[in-house]
Amino acid sequence: MGHDIDQVAPLLREPANFQLRTNCDPHEDNFGLRAHGPLVRIVGESSTQLGRDFVWQAHGYEVVRRILGDHEHFTTRPQFTQSKSGAHVEAQFVGQISTYDPPEHTRLRKMLTPEFTVRRIRRMEPAIQSLIDDRLDLLEAEGPSADLQGLFADPVGAHALCELLGIPRDDQREFVRRIRRNADLSRGLKARAADSAAFNRYLDNLLARQRADPDDGLLGMIVRDHGDNVTDEELKGLCTALILGGVETVAGMIGFGVLALLDNPGQIELLFESPEKAERVVNELVRYLSPVQAPNPRLAIKDVVIDGQLIKAGDYVLCSILMANRDEALTPDPDVLDANRAAVSDVGFGHGIHYCVGAALARSMLRMAYQTLWRRFPGLRLAVPIEEVKYRSAFVDCPDQVPVTW
């Protein structure tokens, strides 16, 4: 990264299909932005929502990694601001760790990390495997054609997270339903606000029970070990962050992963070649698919020069994870799915202090899901052309349905 300021980046109109996909690949509009360099200025819906004349768009790997790892010059904490449309951007989501800076971020993250150690993940794997087996039993009973997304991909991540948090099993179905309704951006703000209020009431009751009698789930563990140092609002925020970051991400990675592997069948056999190769398949799918296309906007809190461009304090930067992971600066032939490529340090699960705390658990779940699916259904194939697969409007990219047959 140079420190000299080059000519100011051109101001570009935000494309209509900005941050959308064409099946498993970035929409071609994203490549149009890349032609102007790894860091550009755009004006459009994003700048209007953030109350700025323009925002920076970072899509080169080195630039994105630099920005995600720099909490000296950038913050993810939302600010009170009046946008041009009259809408307000909220100041802070209490407890949602992705919007915190040190030292508050450090305090909350330390509460979570014991639950995501390798030892803890190994202890969870039998329960996750049982859940995967049960969902595939239901898929098979529905067959020989069924919606893999609705019967398998969606429930696996959601119910595994419920078990992790300590959500009672009798509550899990309704809990998951509310998660999905609240994340559905196609529903109106009023409807989503009502769902959010009901969800918060449920969390209030759950936390009251955990305060009185903590169980062995993540919430119970935090209450037992840190009860005097964490508020209920922070606990609710941690729950929300884990739900938004975990449920849809795993669902999207299973659904998109199946689409990608069916389109690249030579990669499927690598899942069974060795544990190391299976791990590489999962890592390559995370790089190739990057279901969380754009993390929280970064707000510059100090002037900083990146890639020859002066980003001033008060400027917002949007980072494209998907485009960064499809950059030749990261790996040759980045638009090819190839688990045999040399290992890379992609940003599929983020980078820096906001690196996904549950990344190792997610990888373990994905490996088990892919392996068990193809062990049970070696003749799996799409029941429709991939162009007919529909995608949902949510915080994380995810197929709405994946019709399969076997």
UniProtKB/Swiss-Prot annotation:
Keyword terms, alphabetized: Heme, Iron, Metal-binding, Monooxygenase, Oxidoreductase
A Pfam family hit: p450
Keyword Heme set for record: yes
Protein residues bound to heme: 356
EC identifiers of the protein: 1.14.-.-
GO BP terms, alphabetized: vancomycin biosynthetic process
Cofactor(s) listed: heme
InterPro entries: Cyt_P450 (IPR001128), Cyt_P450_B (IPR002397), Cyt_P450_CS (IPR017972), Cyt_P450_sf (IPR036396)
Recorded GO MF terms: heme binding; iron ion binding; monooxygenase activity; oxidoreductase activity, acting on paired donors, with incorporation or reduction of molecular oxygen
UniProt keyword annotation of Oxidoreductase present: yes
Function of the molecule: Involved in the coupling of aromatic side chains of the heptapeptide of vancomycin.
Family according to the record: Belongs to the cytochrome P450 family.
Name of the featured protein: Cytochrome P450 165C4
Species for this entry: Amycolatopsis orientalis (Nocardia orientalis)
